[in-house]
Amino acid sequence: MKRLALGLVVALAAGAAGAETVNFDSTKAGALPPSWLAGITGPGRAQWAVTPDPTAASAPNVLKQSGQVASHSYPWCVKKDISLQNGFVAVKFKPLSGQEDQAGGVVWRWQDGDNYYIARGNALENNIILFRMAHGQRKALHRVPMTVTGNQWHSLRVDFSGSHISVSFDGHKAMEWDDQTFTKAGAAGVWTKADSVTEFDDFQYGSR
């Protein structure tokens, strides 16, 4: 493992060409990490910021979404300077609270705020769901019941190549699926839903 300048990005030698991890530890609390873009699909205003958490997977910092938005609104935060067509994206996430949802997930092949893929876990529903967001309309492609515990760190990983998508949760294969809605390269990042307050750490990505 090799730490690059500012300690923000950790280069990983195995698993994928040019694989990297962002741990948010060199970003000032209250700010967004460099080269990240935050927004929301739907009405409302997301609140993304780096914040300290001593329980972080790689302490001291995490990326947190704490905005309270409408039930059919989806806050996202993407690393805008990457473009992945085939590869993987992974993250550790901790759902903290939410009356309607306690969700955390990853997005990939992100074209804009209305067009991208999502895989997420939800501590209120105890499931993992693969979605596509096309023209601002979310559609569930496949879902699997799995235990997602609130206030606990979990890992989520998606491998994608062509139309094939493979999702793993806490080190276990959750699902495999095929979809051809988005085939072009795009950005990748993290995602929540509605009133979910969720923390993220060790965001990892790589191309193949």
Where are these regions (language model features)?
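Extracellular glycan-recognition surfaces and repeat-rich motifs
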Residues: 31-63, 73
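Short, aromatic/His-centered strand-loop micro-motif at the edge of beta-sheets
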Residues: 134-157
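Secretory/extracellular carbohydrate-interaction modules
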Residues: 29, 65-134, 193
